[in-house]
């Protein structure tokens, strides 16, 4: 699995020579609370520095402090008009995190992208049953959905597979995406290809940009939630930074997203290109 130590990328190149480098070093060491304290001190000393506030927004997002991250984005937009496209993109991504939590709590239904699939309904019903404490019934519905979902072969890079699924059994053959500012589920049977690059900014550890080609030939850009939904609440700093994937006693995963196939496992940050073979459906 890729170990994305603090991937400052473009941001880091603008922080060279700044005391904010202390915060970056603390991030490399996986010390989120200490990094936040150091960065907040620097922002207080340079409140009109938009670059520092972008750094702060990203760090707060990694830590799941969504309201504070949203506030920093607002300030960035006021300080630097050229940053407004980024501000809009990630402001809606933060909003989608709230909706995402409601979906996994069984209280909301996500948008479904592409051709409707009947097997999606049991997956959503299972989330509601989980919330009501009916774990066995939820698992039965998931098994029903997995049996009905088509196994679509393809390749990860040059490595072939007969089927692919998310390691989170609540999702299985479904990909979580943020497209056009909306949180959605994309059945993998509706996906032709996915392309991503390695994380190059801290925010990529939360939402990884991707290029999607749908089975119907349409193409779009998206953000992929890079960490599992319970990561902020139940994961440690390494999980929040996407440096590992682990399972809680409840069976739920935290940390970096992981895909499983008949041939093995691939972490999201190790993935560059995923291609599914065309189907008759």
UniProtKB/Swiss-Prot annotation:
SUPFAM superfamilies: ImpE-like (SSF144059). Gene3D superfamilies: Tetratricopeptide repeat domain (1.25.40.10). Disruption phenotype: Deletion has no detectable effect on the T6SS-mediated secretion of VgrG1a/c, Hcp1 or Tse3. Pfam families: ImpE (PF07024), TPR_19 (PF14559). The T6SS protein TagJ/HsiE1 is unique to the H1-T6SS and absent from the H2- and H3-T6SSs. Component of the H1 type VI (H1-T6SS) secretion system that plays a role in the release of toxins targeting both eukaryotic and prokaryotic species. Forms a stable complex with TssB1. This complex, although not crucial for the H1-T6SS function, may fine-tune the assembly of the system. Plays a role in the interaction between ClpV1 and the TssC1/TssB1 sheath. Interacts with TssB1 (via N-terminus). Interacts with ClpV1. This is Type VI secretion system accessory component TagJ. It comes from Pseudomonas aeruginosa (strain ATCC 15692 / DSM 22644 / CIP 104116 / JCM 14847 / LMG 12228 / 1C / PRS 101 / PAO1). The lineage of its organism: Bacteria, Pseudomonadati, Pseudomonadota, Gammaproteobacteria, Pseudomonadales. The gene is tagJ.
